[in-house]
Amino acid sequence: MSAIEVTGLEREFPGGIRAVDGVDLEVAEGEIYAFLGPNGAGKTTTVRMLTTLLRPTGGSARVAGHDVVSEAGQVRRAIGVALQEAALDPLMTGRELIELQATLHGIPRAEAGRRGEALLDRVGLSEAAGRRVGGYSGGMRRRLDLASALVHEPRVLFLDEPTTGLDPVSRKGIWEEVSALNREGTTVFLTTQYLEEADQLANRVGIIARGGIVAEGTPASLKAEIGNPHLEIGLVDGSPETAAQVCRAFGRPLPERDGKVLLELEGGAGDVAQVVRALDEAGILVESLELVEPTLDDVFVAKTGEHIEEEASG
């Protein structure tokens, strides 16, 4: 069964600017789906439509079985949303904020308190629950926002760049929590600028560029589309041109980089030993070898023509 079904989704802004142009995608229940795209590609606009914050100008979308236009209320009750720039009242304590969110979802006061305490404990904020949010670090605020999005036990969770700007330890903590939620059955729709995050967490990845989906699949299948692994060979001595000629029997030589011979291996990693043997027989001494597998960054560049912009952690 599908948690999210999108067909021909469009959004045109005044002046004829079409930010989203015929997006089709489907997310199965229980999946983690990573949605990637360059700045201005239509990623945020798509998410805003799926979460009922923006009305489509064409096409259709159903989330948790409900139409995002005609059944927007049902959609909102079925989803949790944690935005990159969460509007958390700095004067409220973490506990007060969680309980307020629960009340807004119609949860009785006693149950709101119970759920709030359980969620604060889950995201590691029990000790800080009585402190004002204005004194929280970036990582703590992100965890509080995640807890707020979970207070009504949503079927589908939308996470908008949940770890942007966080230090590696905080980022890993969010990853672990998202994975745990998914194991419990929550469908996760994740936008991220960290390709490693998509590779680690997602069952499937969709890449949007120029308003439309340009690639979709598992991280492994998308990387396999780009090509075979390549071998970076550093030489003690000998001509790189001669080495490339010897290597031609095992794959396609690529342009030299930093004085190293690059070879796309047609037979995969199993050919490495044969390449070394052939170079040795030709009297070419090898100083270093590195087998480099295709990455999601390679996929992103191939499909969009751009590198994704990653912010430094802080």
Indicate residue ranges for each PLM-predicted region.
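ABC transporter nucleotide-binding domain
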Residues: 176-266
